Amino acid sequence: FNKPLIAKIMYFLRILPMVRQRDGLRNVLKNHDTQEIIIETIENDVRFCMYPEGRHRPAHSLLPLGKGIFRAALAANAKFGESKPVYIVPTGIEYGDYFRYRSTSLVTFGKPLNVTEFIKGLDVENEAQMMEPLRKELSARMSELFSYLPDGEDLQDRWTLVKMMSV
């Protein structure tokens, strides 16, 4: 997104940047513009994809979910949640072989999480307090959608066992 031509193409395709604090505080302020585009997209009933982990690794586990997806959902809910509910659809992506080119993959969609209803049931007052229960719920739902193996020293051994048992 630092190259103007590439940035224009990415924005046209609705591939939007979410900047982290490690990229500099000045750059983090650009997330406000991205969030406005996301809210407008949701309000117009256009579906889009957001990767809440923000990165990947070749393991069948779930990385910590970033705040971006929750900030966007809560901002959209604050803007129009009374008239139209806001949903997050948990998705699991399972790779047949992470390192092999043209390997298989399986995309599984879970039951949509109605953010509007979920936060109504919370006894909290501010956005920061809403994020943690949302994060836990989405993490739990995503973990059910792929061969989830919790982090640990024997992660590779457990994955080998899962592959052997699936044959």
Show where each model-derived region lies.
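Soluble catalytic domains of membrane acyltransferases
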Residues: 1-126
